[in-house]
Curated annotation (Swiss-Prot):
Its EC number is 2.1.1.228. InterPro entries: Alpha/beta_knot_MTases, tRNA_m1G_MeTrfase_C_sf, tRNA_m1G_MeTrfase_TrmD, tRNA_m1G_MTases_N, tRNA_MeTrfase_TRMD/TRM10. This is tRNA (guanine-N(1)-)-methyltransferase. The lineage of its organism: Bacteria, Pseudomonadati, Pseudomonadota, Gammaproteobacteria, Legionellales. The gene is trmD. It comes from Legionella pneumophila subsp. pneumophila (strain Philadelphia 1 / ATCC 33152 / DSM 7513). The keyword Transit peptide does not apply.
Length: 250
């Protein structure tokens, strides 16, 4: 059965970008189904207005309760039972790869609410949203791009969505570390060579090299991640070798 993903959005055209690449192929293969609902379709105001001035004053406009509530209610009825509603907001919990793995493992329909303007009426969040997530400590013009990022990351974790079974498992953050470097043909270009170990065909040595590089890249670029990963004695040895090779104390 296809995983059903939905988006409440004022700009459904933006979400159409998900129909390309890996995510598009997953849709074509029937692994996932994506629908959009526009709150304007449930607006009783002139010109399908869905926003109004904030109580208490202040700049900008706020998305109104009524059309959002009606859109969410309709979407959830079409997505049937076992549907989780997610609001994408800078105020939400910052999503990590482990969070995405847990969400994907639940195989639960997901309805994303993409806000616009200054935000949405708080009563929607407090009474009709199950979880609030953020991509990070920055602000976007709307939640559509955040929803697409979330959807892309979820689809990558669906078995069969990628061309190779191990592709998702090698992604950065899947094991708490950054991914190892990747190379392709030619073996030499502009005086730059592919590491010899990758050309030798010794899979055990290649695996060891990739693990060392993964540990090393994490140490160089995201040392904070190493504090959260339980390293084996072999990992510690590989990391020590990497540090020595890169000018750190041996």
């Amino acid at each position: 059965m296809a995983l059903h993903l939905g988006v409440i959005t004022l700009l459904p055209e933006i979400i159409q970008g998900i129909h390309y690449g890996v995510t598009g192929r997953a849709i074509e293969q029937g692994l996932v189904k994506i629908d959009c609902w526009n709150p304007r379709d449930w607006s009783s105001r002139p010109y399908k207005q869905v926003d109004d001035k904030p109580y208490g004053g202040g700049p900008g406009m706020v998305m109104m309760y009524e059309p959002l509530h009606a859109a969410i209610k309709h979407a959830r009825s079409e997505m049937k039972e076992n549907c989780k509603t997610i609001y994408l907001s800078p105020q939400g919990k910052v999503v990590r790869q482990n969070d995405l793995k847990q969400i994907a493992a639940q195989k639960q329909s997901l309805l994303f609410v993409a806000g616009r303007y200054e935000g949405i009426d708080e009563r929607i969040i407090s009474h009709h949203v199950d979880e609030e997530w953020s991509l990070g400590d920055f602000v976007l013009s709307g939640g559509e791009l955040a929803a697409m990022v979330f959807i892309d990351a979820i689809i990558r974790l669906i078995p069969g969505s990628l061309g190779h079974l191990g592709s998702a498992e090698q992604d950065s953050f899947m094991n708490g570390l950054l991914d190892c470097p990747h190379y392709t043909r030619p073996a030499t270009i502009n005086g730059l060579d592919v590491p010899d170990v990758l050309l030798g065909g010794n899979h055990k040595e290649i695996e060891r090299w990739r693990r060392k590089q993964s540990l090393g890249k994490t140490w160089l670029k995201r040392p904070d991640l190493l504090e959260k990963v339980q390293l084996s004695e072999t990992d510690k040895q590989l990391l020590a070798e990497f540090k020595c090779e890169h000018g750190d104390s041996c």
